[in-house]
Amino acid sequence: MPKEEKAVEVDLRYPVGKWTTKGPFTNAQRHTMIESVGAAPANFRAAVAGLNDNQLSTPYRPGGWTLRQTIHHVADSHMNAYIRFRLGITEAEPTVKPYDEKTWAELFDARTAPVEISLGLIDGIHKRWVMLLETVREIDFNRNVRHPEHGTMSLDDLLALYEWHGRHHAAHITALRQRAGW
């Protein structure tokens, strides 16, 4: 009997795959990730360019955040990431504060504010973040932060996580645009 072909079902939650990459990394690998962090603001602007309010109010998947909430989440998350890096560079294994991203995404501003506000935040944070990342000494990427939920993470791990995070959420938006023909 011939084998039945199963359709490959794409997991809409993870359009670029789940985050699995952990350090330590080479300087070349770090440089590539830092370039990706630097490109993220333009990628988000391109992802939402020309979308109207109804489109921005569309969830990227059933049960998921709207495109608007996704952009606001990235601003919230990457502001926290920038602070976590600064703490990791300047303190001995600091404990970083988690936040309830799901609750934050349901706040009024995350559901209704124009995406341009958070795109501006993403622009500014990423410029400062890249300036910081480009000056971190190789040995300092081995420094750790303690996250109450995720345990000990090196700055290499944080860099990889947030580089992935930017691509992950930009792909949520671009994948919906492709599926919807926008």
Where on the chain are the PLM-derived regions?
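Acidic/histidine-rich alpha-helical segments that form the ligand environment
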Residues: 30, 35-41, 45-47, 103-142, ...
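Positions in alpha-helical segments
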Residues: 28-32, 69, 83, 113-117, ...
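Short, contiguous alpha-helical
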Residues: 1-20, 57-103, 127-131, 138, ...
